[in-house]
């Protein structure tokens, strides 16, 4: 934790629950085999045994204690190099103006197959141990094991996950086939917003009882293609050269030179410098760079590491989220994808098509250059958020999931839709890339339309009439808003709807009761209305 007189920020890595630690801890790790057999994980040790930034939390302020990641043994679910798995669960937050509970907190969790490897590294002399693991055959014909590179917990875990005492390294390995992993965590505070996962077919429950939030997430690991390329300036395609020239003139562009580098370095020709681009997976730049490098990389991924992780989206990623999602309390949804690049934030809502849209991107082939890479997408949406977006009820049984390529042509995909315990779940699998858009739509039977009304073109249907037509209970303390799906016929203006031209004006009215002690999480209700404009 970092502190000052004005407050502090903290990043707490949680350990296992014990008799003394009953909250802000990992309750358990479970593996489920393909035949349905459940294998309970057993806590083995912290790794390292003690971290350099461990700290004792503050129960009165809801700040958990922070320690190292933990190793768990799944004896009945071994991977290729043993049965140890590293579990990392992080809660990140801050104290502002004397309050550590109100500021939004982020949540991260991951499971990684590992084996402990004893290296010859001595931090007293090396400073940092080297962590790129490789096997080489020497001139004498014998195999030697070496490490190179800077020790860092980065690059999607391809290098050592982390380091322990006396030069021990936790090497990452592939997940075993056919094993689903479930992680159960207890928290003193509830995460909020939207979760993003690198996993397949997640099933989640988030319950708060007696001031303890229990998160249980079960999912299969997924393989995410890594896209990387390098080349001398002269051999790079013209489009890539032009991109570097435009973006890196008088700009650092990711080399070891400091950001504030001046003089000859920045005026040096782009062609004479080492330049690195490493855009975020959810950035517009990532989509642009994938398109630029596709031909040079022969449309082939450089690696296919398997992952199992989930995180809350940051504030910057949530800026464009639909109001129904941003105003929701607690975790409002989960999206999971195996694409190299994906849309920033939650899926965007298109009022014209009444669909939640999400764009992804990847190269067409796996590392072997032959096997087509098949996309996977999961969307889990809390029922009250779905109600707010679509104006549907929990009993809705009609949904569509479609995948459309950049050319507007539908792509073949296996899709599914279920509803269980307050959550709608959608999935699309088996589609190809490069940058398709996945659209999810919930619809209600026609008898869900509450009321039809005749209105005149050029008039405004005010709030009072819309509330009456909706048939919803409304108090002056309630929040309300209206969403139009036919903007060419009518549009929202002020607190009403302006009828622009003849046709059918379709809209949804939403009402959310005020938060109270008796109703701490009020449910948003909605009703669909059709105005016949003449």
Place the predicted regions along the sequence by residue.
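Extracytoplasmic soluble-region selector
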Residues: 447-534
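Proteolytic processing hotspots in large secreted/extracellular or virion-associated proteins
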Residues: 338-400
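C-terminal beta-strand-rich structural cap/linker in extracellular carbohydrate-active enzymes
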Residues: 424-446
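Short proline/glycine-enriched turn/loop motifs at strand-loop junctions of beta-rich domains
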Residues: 393-398, 406-409, 473-479
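Solvent-exposed serine/threonine-rich low-complexity stretches and specific carbohydrate-binding patches
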Residues: 409-422
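Exposed aromatic-hydrophobic patches
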Residues: 376-390, 423-430, 469, 493-498
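Long, leucine/valine-rich, helix-dominated scaffolding and oligomerization segments
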Residues: 1-333
């Amino acid at each position: 934790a970092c502190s000052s007189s004005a407050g502090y920020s903290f990043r707490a890595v949680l350990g296992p629950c014990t008799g003394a630690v009953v909250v802000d801890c990992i309750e358990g790790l479970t593996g489920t085999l393909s035949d349905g057999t459940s294998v309970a994980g057993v806590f083995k040790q912290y790794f390292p045994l003690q971290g350099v930034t461990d700290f004792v939390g503050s129960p009165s302020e809801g700040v958990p204690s922070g320690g190292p990641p933990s190793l768990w043994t799944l004896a009945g679910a071994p991977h290729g190099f043993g049965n140890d798995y590293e579990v990392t669960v992080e809660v990140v937050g801050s104290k502002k103006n004397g309050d550590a509970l109100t500021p939004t907190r982020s949540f991260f969790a991951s499971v990684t197959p590992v084996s402990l490897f004893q290296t010859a590294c001595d931090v007293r002399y090396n400073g940092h141990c080297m962590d790129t693991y490789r096997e080489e055959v020497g001139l004498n014909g014998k195999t030697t094991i070496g490490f190179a590179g800077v020790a860092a917990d980065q690059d999607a875990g391809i290098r050592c996950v982390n380091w322990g005492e006396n030069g021990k390294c936790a090497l990452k390995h592939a997940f075993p086939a056919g094993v689903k992993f479930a992680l159960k965590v207890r928290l003193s505070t509830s995460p909020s917003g939207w979760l993003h996962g690198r996993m397949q077919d997640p099933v989640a429950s988030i319950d708060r009882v007696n001031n303890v939030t229990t998160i249980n997430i079960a999912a299969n690991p997924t393989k995410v293609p890594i896209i990387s390329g390098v080349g001398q300036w002269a051999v790079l395609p013209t489009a890539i050269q032009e991109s570097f020239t435009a973006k890196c003139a008088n700009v650092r562009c990711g080399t070891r030179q400091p950001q504030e580098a001046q003089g000859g370095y920045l005026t040096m020709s782009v062609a004479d410098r080492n330049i690195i681009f490493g855009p975020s997976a959810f950035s517009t730049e990532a989509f642009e760079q994938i398109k630029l490098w596709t031909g040079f990389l022969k449309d082939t991924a450089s690696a296919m590491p398997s992952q199992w992780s989930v995180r809350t989206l940051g504030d910057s990623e949530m800026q464009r989220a639909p109001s129904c999602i941003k105003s929701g309390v607690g975790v409002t949804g989960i999206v999971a994808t195996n694409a190299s690049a994906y849309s920033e934030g939650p899926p965007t809502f298109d009022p014209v098509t009444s669909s939640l849209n999400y764009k992804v991107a990847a190269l067409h082939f796996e590392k072997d250059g032959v096997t087509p890479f098949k996309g996977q997408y999961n969307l889990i949406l809390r029922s009250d958020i779905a109600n707010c977006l679509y104006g549907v009820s929990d009993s809705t049984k009609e949904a569509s999931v479609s995948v459309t390529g950049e050319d507007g042509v539908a792509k073949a995909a296996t899709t599914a839709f279920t509803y269980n315990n307050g959550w709608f779940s959608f999935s699309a699998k088996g589609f190809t890339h490069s940058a398709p858009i996945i659209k999810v739509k919930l619809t209600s039977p026609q008898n869900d339309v509450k009321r039809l009304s005749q209105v005149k073109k050029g008039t405004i249907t005010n709030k009072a009439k819309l509330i009456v037509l909706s048939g919803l209970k409304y108090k002056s303390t309630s929040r309300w808003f209206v969403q139009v799906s036919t903007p060419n016929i009518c549009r929202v203006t002020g607190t009403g709807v302006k009828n622009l031209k003849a046709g059918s004006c379709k809209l949804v009215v939403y009402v959310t009761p005020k938060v109270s002690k008796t109703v701490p999480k009020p449910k948003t209700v909605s009703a669909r209305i059709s105005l016949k404009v003449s």
